[in-house]
């Protein structure tokens, strides 16, 4: 017989990668009881993204994670875009900080993801379960039931 567990949460986030963990931090900041279910047992050790802009840093400012994230970033970097033939077609040079944060920032995703995920540990009302994959869910007037393996 399959093991059954019950969690009382206002929000369930399926996926604890950068987006899900960021949402978890935002919900944690506002006191929302949250369950995060992540299929992978740990943070994936290769990057899938490399850049973060000032708008993203504003969201992380809300969670208190902007400064820790900046420690591992190359800030306010010049970006050059090239065609497949090697010819440059655009150059973006960030000069201003209209929102108070550097505009173009390069990062190593696994490092940033560790900061974001560790931020969740500040909140006793957030539960993160890694190595748990949602197979199906049903919703009725009583709530949501997930089948998780």
Annotate each PLM feature.
Residues 10, 33-35, 127:
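Structural signature of beta-strand start/N-cap positions in the alpha/beta core
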Residues 15-18, 39, 109:
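Glycine-rich Rossmann-fold phosphate-binding loop(s) that bind the pyrophosphate
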Residues 138-149:
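Conserved beta-strand-loop-beta-strand element in the redox core of flavoprotein oxidoreductases
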């Amino acid at each position: 017989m399959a093991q059954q567990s019950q969690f009382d949460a206002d929000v369930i986030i399926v996926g604890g990668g950068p987006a899900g963990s960021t949402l978890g931090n935002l919900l944690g900041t506002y006191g929302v009881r949250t369950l995060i279910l992540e299929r992978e047992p740990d943070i994936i050790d290769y990057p899938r993204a490399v850049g973060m802009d000032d708008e993203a840093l504003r969201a992380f400012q809300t969670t208190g994670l902007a400064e820790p994230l900046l420690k591992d970033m190359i800030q306010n970097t010049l970006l050059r875009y090239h065609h497949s033939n090697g010819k440059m077609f655009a150059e973006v040079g960030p000069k201003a900080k209209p929102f108070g944060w550097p505009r173009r920032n390069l990062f190593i995703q696994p490092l940033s993801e560790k900061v974001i995920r560790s931020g969740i540990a500040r909140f006793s009302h957030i539960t993160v379960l890694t190595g748990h994959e949602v197979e199906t869910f049903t919703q009725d007037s009583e709530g949501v039931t997930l089948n998780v393996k």
